[in-house]
């Protein structure tokens, strides 16, 4: 809500109807530093700011592939967004947007879940059209658990495993898997990694 309010919108809540309402005559560009690099928060601010009057600057913006593709689509529709793929987005408001066609990215959480499922069950799987270049460290994180993750074009092949061995460092210690904002590991896959690591 805070980012949209900084653009000039007013929120109200009616407890009797349990309803939030938002109102704004005209949104105006603003500077904002987000408390957290929220994907949903950044996306909502971005969609509002492209039609706001003037310049909006978002520091600590989320930069996950989801935001990159949203920004690319909005730019093709006539928006003026710069800094795509970084944590600093600058949006010059435009009067209107036009139409476009867009193909959405495969869901990286689904791709990671399928890799984990194949590893847990010792199954052979080929995952088609994974958007491999936008998976970040997901494939390498599974490889560090000893899982063979083969890239074949935009597909991923995980062959049958009877067992797998977690990599150790030169001193014999084992790795730590932790979530982090993009390009780090998405927290949505930690439960999958936890189960895979215990098999």
What are these regions (language model features)?
Residues 1-199:
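Structural preference for solvent-exposed beta-strand-turn elements
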């Amino acid at each position: 809500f805070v980012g949209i309010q900084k653009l000039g919108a007013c929120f109200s809540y009616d407890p009797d109807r349990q309803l939030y309402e938002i109102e704004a005559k005209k949104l105006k560009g603003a500077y904002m530093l987000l408390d957290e690099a929220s994907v949903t928060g950044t996306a909502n601010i971005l969609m509002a700011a492209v039609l706001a009057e003037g310049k909006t600057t978002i520091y600590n913006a989320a930069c996950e592939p989801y935001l990159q593709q949203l920004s690319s689509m909005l730019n093709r529709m006539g928006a003026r967004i710069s800094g795509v793929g970084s944590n600093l987005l600058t949006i010059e408001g435009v009067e209107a947007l036009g139409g476009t066609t867009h193909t959405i990215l495969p869901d990286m959480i689904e791709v990671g879940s399928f890799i984990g499922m194949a590893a847990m069950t010792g199954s052979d799987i080929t995952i088609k059209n994974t958007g491999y270049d936008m998976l970040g460290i997901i494939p390498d994180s599974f490889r560090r658990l000893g899982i063979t993750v083969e890239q074949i074009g935009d597909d991923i092949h995980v062959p049958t495993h009877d067992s797998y061995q977690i990599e150790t460092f030169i001193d014999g210690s084992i790795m730590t898997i932790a979530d982090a904002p993009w390009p780090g590991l998405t927290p949505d896959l930690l439960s999958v990694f936890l189960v895979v690591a215990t098999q």
